[in-house]
Structure formats: structure tokens, C-alpha cells
Amino acid sequence: MVGLGACTLTGVTLIFLLLPRSLESCGHIEISPPVVRLGDPVLASCTISPNCSKLDQQAKILWRLQDEPIQPGDRQHHLPDGTQESLITLPHLNYTQAFLFCLVPWEDSVQLLDQAELHAGYPPASPSNLSCLMHLTTNSLVCQWEPGPETHLPTSFILKSFRSRADCQYQGDTIPDCVAKKRQNNCSIPRKNLLLYQYMAIWVQAENMLGSSESPKLCLDPMDVVKLEPPMLQALDIGPDVVSHQPGCLWLSWKPWKPSEYMEQECELRYQPQLKGANWTLVFHLPSSKDQFELCGLHQAPVYTLQMRCIRSSLPGFWSPWSPGLQLRPTMKAPTIRLDTWCQKKQLDPGTVSVQLFWKPTPLQEDSGQIQGYLLSWSSPDHQGQDIHLCNTTQLSCIFLLPSEAQNVTLVAYNKAGTSSPTTVVFLENEGPAVTGLHAMAQDLNTIWVDWEAPSLLPQGYLIEWEMSSPSYNNSYKSWMIEPNGNITGILLKDNINPFQLYRITVAPLYPGIVGPPVNVYTFAGERAPPHAPALHLKHVGTTWAQLEWVPEAPRLGMIPLTHYTIFWADAGDHSFSVTLNISLHDFVLKHLEPASLYHVYLMATSRAGSTNSTGLTLRTLDPSDLNIFLGILCLVLLSTTCVVTWLCCKRRGKTSFWSDVPDPAHSSLSSWLPTIMTEETFQLPSFWDSSVPSITKITELEEDKKPTHWDSESSGNGSLPALVQAYVLQGDPREISNQSQPPSRTGDQVLYGQVLESPTSPGVMQYIRSDSTQPLLGGPTPSPKSYENIWFHSRPQETFVPQPPNQEDDCVFGPPFDFPLFQGLQVHGVEEQGGF
């Protein structure tokens, strides 16, 4: 069952196949006619038998053509026998092959009753271009034709013929027909059905279901359409005496195909050198058989290809196919060339020189002979005129070793026929003036123009040499040429020039017997844009400006110089700007930018060959608020630094204003300040003793007590002394100097305060009070320093000393402070510092 709106060809066919036999026999389709011309109308009828009980007697008959929509018939009626019939006319059948279906409604779908196949096409056109050939190989007459347009219908082609006389106006015996195979446009009449040398009429008949047609009749004699087979070519072996006298010739022979030996034939020979772009050359009116044929005047090509074909002589017929190609090498003649040479020498040691010789053959005539190799030799005086072969090569260069005294070598080109005229190569010295102003420039991708200024001495010619200057290129091969005209100052190099390669070009002038010094220049073949542009770097940026910099590429050999730079920048709104800069600039400042904005910048490097862009650089200008914050932080840091420095300076100055800058004796190594032997000094205490009191005779060094002790601060008479006098009590004549020496102190030991032990004239032992002060000596009383003990001093009984008032005439109670031994080492800055005490 198939839906009414979706009934397809596959669906209805499947339903038809699955129908029961009783339902299948209910309907029947008739087509009139079943095959029509494409586009013609088709009449069809569908009948339903009255014996079909499964269908309603009033069922409506429907039609469907191929995949087109279902449609009712043109007219439906009942026949007298109760059969229902539906008629339909298809106005245009546009299918070459289609199915027509007869349907009836069945519940919610349609039921297939019957189907019929329709065919449409065209009647066959008359075949054309009928031709026949008599093949002696198959011994049959083979005819072929063109069938004409496609008919879309099965069409058969029949080759018909009959024997006749004269111009085929009289029909004789009929020859059996030849039916061509399907989709073949030829047919053969065997030899047994043919009468040679008798005319026959031949034509082709085409037939299909819509009609038939015939080609025009062809009247011929089978022997007039004979197609021969090609002859057999052979090469002849000629003796060497003939070859040497006749260079540039070929010798060959041929024989006709054996079945056609009895026929008179005329042949053609064609030959072609195996060279690019060479054409065939024809030789006409040759006989069908030749035991020896000489073909001369050939160019010195490596190999020639020869072919031959034949036709019946003086009679109608067809040319045979060309014979298979025969490859022959023409006889040679000795090369007739001029050898241009150029050499380079290198001294290996005092007795040996290495020579690299280049040469180039120049033909002296159109047919200069084939070259099979080059022979380079040297005549050594030690070998009594016998030549020493240095090189035997097919290349155009050779490297060899010679004694330093060798002056020349001999070069010849050779082949089987002989050698060319010898060329003497003289080793020239590099003397004479060189060319100046050498310049090279690429004209296009495969040519380079080279020019120069002629030297002061006009040369006979110039040697131009060029080679690739690349690490990956083999420098052993060089291209070179000799310009024989010394007046020329420029030349175009065309050979062996590859695009976009760096070339080293050398020009040397040629003088009689010498060659000038070579001059080099480098250039590229075919200029192109620089490979890359310098990379941009952001140096500084502000709110409305940005400074850019770049590093130019280092120049290289042959490098095309840049002409200028161009900087392009664009903002986020695709507003682009540009500026062109001189090639000497390496930085640039972009101005008038928007604050806090993004910009895309790139640099373009330009030469005369093109331009190349650098990689893009993206920058962002500063925001004014960010700049203010930055400046505020900077000012705050500077202010803080200034305050700290000022505070430190003021602190040091305040400390100096309270006391002098004197080291602390208790925490200093004063031993290094004192001399090794300390001079005893006489200390005086004014107004305490008279002039008869002897001076101090001995000063001992006290040791530091492990357990600190304190002097009796309540000794009698101390209260009346000044504070400074309480710290140190001295005796002796102030003008008297003791000559006794102090024992040397150890280096690094602390220098302790001294104590007077005894005096010969002293009425009693006096006790001296040590100060515990660790501060520099001041004018007022200070705390006592750490006490020190002396064993001998403590063993004596303590005595009280009552001081007297000081003499007002003295400037100091106990003289200048530097009279005290412990202050001798403080005299390091001069006497001018005494005011600090």
C-alpha cells in the first residue's frame, strides 16, 4: 500500500509484484503505439474485468506516468459486457523510456492493476562517409561509416553489396550481407565473396522500430582500394674508408612487404634529427625496393629517426602506414671549432703550480662536427718532445698540476673522424691596468647587465666570469665568456642565470700576452623586496606621544639598498596614519596621540624592488590620572628621603655640639696610639707643695681588677678639691721632667690610668682617686670610671691627703691636658683641637 500523494515508481511496482493472482488479472493496459517518436502523443486504455469481485463495480480508474502525479483518465465508461474502460491520451511523450501505470483507489491508498513500458526515439539517419579498404593482411574488404545522430532506440546496421559492371548501373549477383556488431561502425566482406578487378556496389542500411535509411552507394574495384603494408628499413654497414671521406651521411636499404611484392609501388622516406624542435624532412619518389641508399648532407645530430611508407604506383590506392622508426647515427667529421680558453693558477710550492683551465667551443661553420671529448696535453722537455696527457674529458674544465717553469699546454676537441685544430694555451701573467667603475644590475629574472669603465690602456678584449655566491652551491662550475671587442664597456649575461640568486661577477681586461687584474662585483639576479623589515621597539611612551626605535639590518654582499622607511599606525577606530622617513633614521616619535588609547604600529622597509612590513607593535598611551599618581608617589619618595637625610645630619651636628669628638679611652685600643717607650713626665699640682718637693720618680701600669672596687669617696680633704682635681691628683715640680721610662705596653692591650707609688721626699703616702667616667673629659665633674688595682699599691696603708686651693695664676689646675700620658696618643689632629677639652 502506498499513500495517494506519495506513490512512486518503486512503490507501485512492488505492490504490483505482491498482488494476488486474482487481483492481478483484473486490469489490463493497451498502448497504441508502444514506440513513438520522441515528443509525439500516446493513446492508452485500461480495462477492468467484470469478474473481479474484489473491486467495486463503480471504481474510478486512475493513471500515472513514470514519477508524475496521479491523474484521472480522459473518459471512463462501461462496455456492454460489463467491463470498465478508461482512456487517456498523453499529448507529449518526452521520455525515451517510461512506465505507464493503471491504478484504482483502495481504502486510503491506490491499488496497481497493470503497467506498460513506453519507448520513444528517432528513426535512423542515413549513414555517411562510407569508405572501404582492401587489407592484404586479413585478405578482406573492410568498410566503415559514420552512423549519424543518436536514435535512442535499438538500431541495426547492415552492409549490403552486389556485383556490377561499369559504373554500377547494372546489378549483378548479390553478395551476402554483413551485419555490424552492436555499437560498431564497420564490417568486413571476406575474400571469398569478392571478385578482384571487378566493380561492386556497396552501401549501408540502418533500421530501427521507427524506420530505416540507406547510405549513398559506393562503386569500387577492390583492387583500387588496396592498402599496402609499410616496407622494412635496414641500416647498411659501410667500411671505414668510405666513412672518412663522406662525413654527415647515412646508408640504408629497404624491402617491400612480402604479400605486395608483385605490385608496383612508390615510396616516401622521412627523417628527423633527435633534437628539440626539429621537423621531419621528406624524400619523395623512392622505389619499393632498394639494396643501398645514401642520404648525405645531414647535420651533426647525435641520432636520426627514419620512416618509410608506400603506395601502388600509377594506380588508385592508399598509402601504407609509416614503418617503425629506424635510429641511425650519421658519419662524423672532425670538429671545426675555435676554443676560447681561460685559466687560473695557484702556486702550491716553489716547484709545482695548480692550474684550473676553462674552455668554450665556438663553431666556425653551421655544421662544425660533433665533439666527443677534449684532450689536454703538455710537451715536457724531459720526455724528448713526447706529449703528456693531462686531461681527457667531456667537461669544459680541468684541474691539473704542472712544474713552475711550464709556460703553455695544448687543447684539442676530437671525435671518431679526427681532431680539431690544436689550441695553444699560454699562461698569462696578471699585469696591466684593471677596469674601474664595475657595476651590475639585474634586467629581469634571468639576465644581468654588467658595465664598466675602460682602463687607461685599451685592451684587446675582456674576460667576464660569473658564478653563484651561495654556501649551498658548488663553486667548481663557473660560467664565463670572452668579449673580443676591447671597445665594448657593457654586456648582458643570459646563460646560467637563476632568479633571485646572488652572483659574483668578475671582469678582467685582456692585453697582448697578459691579462689585467680581475675586479669583482656582487648582485642579485632579479630584484625582489627585502626579506624582512627591522623590528619595532617601544623606547618611551607618554600621554600623547610614543618614541619608537629599530635596529637596521646589517648590509650584506649584493644586498639591494633600502630607499626609505614608512611607519603606519592606527587607533582602535581604524583611523590610520603614516609617515615616510629617511633611511638614516633609527627612531621616531609619534605625536598627537590620544591619552589612554591603543595603537597598532608597524614599519615598512622599501627598496626599488618592493616593500616588506615588520611585525606589528601594539602600544598604549598613558592615562593622565596614572601620570599624576606616579608623580605624586615620586614626590612623596623624594620628600621622605630629604627628611631622613636632614634628620641624620641634624642628629650628628647635635651630638657634636654637646661634647668633643674624642674616642672613648675605655673602649678603644689606645695602645696603638702610644709609642713603645713612654716618656716619663713630671706632673705638678700648683699650691700643694713647695718648690723643694721632688718629682715623681716612678709610674707603674695598673691592671684591671676582675672584681670592680670603689675608692673611698669620703676620704678627708676631698670635698674641698675641684671635680677635675678629684679625678687626678699629681705631684712634682711642673717644670721638672722625669727621665725614667715606662715599660713598653703590649700591642692591643688597653692603656690603663697610672698611680704614683712613692716619692723619696714625700712625708707620707698619698692616695689617688680614679674617675669612673667613660665619657670624654669635660670641664665639670663626671662619674668615676671603672677602678683598677695595683698589688703593690694596695699593700700600703691608706693616707689622707688634704689638697690646697689651686693657684689662680695657672691656666689649668694640672697643666695642659696633653701632659697626661694617656692623652699623648690623641695628638693626631694637631694642637688646634685642644680647645675641645
From Swiss-Prot:
Main location: membrane
Domain Ig-like C2-type span(s) in chain numbering: 26-118
Topological domains annotated Extracellular: 26-626
Membrane topology (Cytoplasmic): 651-837
Entry comment on modification after translation: N-glycosylated.
Disulphide bridges: C26-C52, C46-C102, C132-C143, C168-C219, C178-C187, C249-C296, C267-C310
One Pfam family here: Lep_receptor_Ig
Motif stretch (Box 1 motif): 658-666
Glycan attachment positions: N51, N94, N129, N186, N279, N392, N408, N474, N487, N582, N613
Record GO cellular component, one term: plasma membrane
Keyword terms, alphabetized: Cell adhesion, Disulfide bond, Glycoprotein, Immunoglobulin domain, Membrane, Receptor, Repeat, Signal, Transmembrane, Transmembrane helix
GO BP term, example: amelogenesis
Sequence ranges assigned to domain Fibronectin type-III in this UniProt record: 126-231, 236-331, 334-433, 434-529, 530-624
Transmembrane stretches, start-end: 627-650
Tissue distribution: Found in bone marrow.
Subcellular location: Membrane
Signal peptide segment: 1-25
Molecular-function GO terms, alphabetical: cytokine receptor activity; granulocyte colony-stimulating factor binding
Family affiliation: Belongs to the type I cytokine receptor family. Type 2 subfamily.
Domain notes: The WSXWS motif appears to be necessary for proper protein folding and thereby efficient intracellular transport and cell-surface receptor binding. The box 1 motif is required for JAK interaction and/or activation.
Subunit organization: Homodimer. The dimeric receptor binds two CSF3 molecules. Interacts with CEACAM1; down-regulates the CSF3R-STAT3 pathway through recruitment of PTPN6 that dephosphorylates CSF3R.
PANTHER family referenced in this protein's UniProt entry, alphabetically: INTERLEUKIN-12 RECEPTOR SUBUNIT BETA-2, INTERLEUKIN-27 RECEPTOR SUBUNIT ALPHA
Annotated function: Receptor for granulocyte colony-stimulating factor (CSF3). In addition it may function in some adhesion or recognition events at the cell surface.
Protein name as it appears in the record: Granulocyte colony-stimulating factor receptor
Organism, scientific name: Mus musculus
Higher taxonomy: Eukaryota, Metazoa, Chordata, Craniata, Vertebrata
Gene from which the chain derives: Csf3r
